[in-house]
Design a protein with these regions (language model features):
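Charged, amphipathic alpha-helical coiled-coil/dimerization segments
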Residues: 79-143
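Hydrophobic structural patches
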Residues: 13, 49-52, 141
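Alpha-helical linker/hinge and terminal dimerization helices associated
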Residues: 16, 20, 27, 31, ...
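Active-site phosphate/pyrophosphate-handling residues
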Residues: 8, 47, 72, 109, ...
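N-terminal helix-turn-helix DNA-binding core of bacterial DNA-binding proteins
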Residues: 22-73, 84, 155-159
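N-terminal leader segment of winged-helix/HTH proteins
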Residues: 1-39, 166-172
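C-terminal regulatory/oligomerization modules of transcriptional regulators
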Residues: 1-4, 132-172
C-alpha cells in the first residue's frame, strides 16, 4: 500500500477537524455552564448564532448558503435554538410569506458572553503561525475544497463559498 493513514492528508484533515470540533464544543459548553445557562451551545448552533449576530434578520435559505449546510439541517438547528429562546422566526414586513430568523435578547447576550472565549480559542488554534502562514493555510484548504470537486462532483464547493479564482473540478 502506497499511502498509509499517517501519510494521508485526508486522514489528517478529518482528524484535525474532529479534534477542533471537540475542543470548540468544550469551550462553548464551559461558558454555558459557568453562566448557569439552561442550554448548551453546539458548534453548529454557534455558526448560526454568529451569522445572525453579524447580519441581523436572515432567512433559513440564506443561513444555509452562507454556512454551507443543507437547509433541512439548518432548520433543525434553528428549531433547537428557538426552543432554547435564543432565536425567533419573524415574518418579513414586506412579504409575509418570507420567514426570517433573528436573535432574541438572550441570543445576543450569549453571543456577548462567547465572544472572548471564542477569540481565545482561535488564538490557541493559530498559536505559532504567522499571519502569512495563516493566510496560506486558508488558501490551501480552499484549494483542497476546489480539488475535491474534480473527483466527486456535487461536493467540494457546492455552496459557492470559495473566493473568486478557485475553479472547482479543473485539475491540471
Amino acid at each position: 500500500m502506497k499511502i498509509r493513514a499517517d501519510n494521508n492528508l485526508g486522514y489528517w484533515l478529518f482528524y484535525s477537524q474532529r479534534s477542533v470540533a471537540y475542543a470548540f464544543s468544550e469551550v462553548l459548553r464551559q461558558v454555558c455552564l459557568e453562566h448557569k445557562k439552561p442550554y448548551i451551545i453546539t458548534p453548529s448552533q454557534w455558526g448560526v448564532l454568529s451569522l445572525l449576530f453579524e447580519t441581523g434578520e436572515i432567512t433559513i435559505g440564506a443561513i444555509s448558503q452562507r454556512r454551507g449546510v443543507d437547509a433541512p439541517t439548518i432548520t433543525g438547528v434553528v428549531k433547537r435554538l428557538e426552543q432554547s429562546g435564543l432565536v425567533e422566526r419573524v415574518h418579513d414586513r414586506g412579504d409575509r410569506r418570507v420567514v426570517k430568523v433573528s436573535l432574541t435578547d438572550e441570543g445576543k447576550s450569549i453571543m456577548d458572553l462567547l465572544a472572548e472565549p471564542v477569540d481565545a480559542f482561535n488564538d490557541i488554534l493559530t498559536h505559532g503561525f504567522s499571519e502569512a502562514e495563516q493566510s496560506d493555510f486558508r488558501t490551501n484548504l480552499q484549494r483542497i475544497i476546489a480539488n475535491v470537486s474534480a473527483v466527486a462532483p456535487g461536493t467540494g464547493d457546492r455552496f459557492g463559498l470559495l473566493p473568486r479564482g478557485f475553479h472547482c473540478g479543473e485539475l491540471e
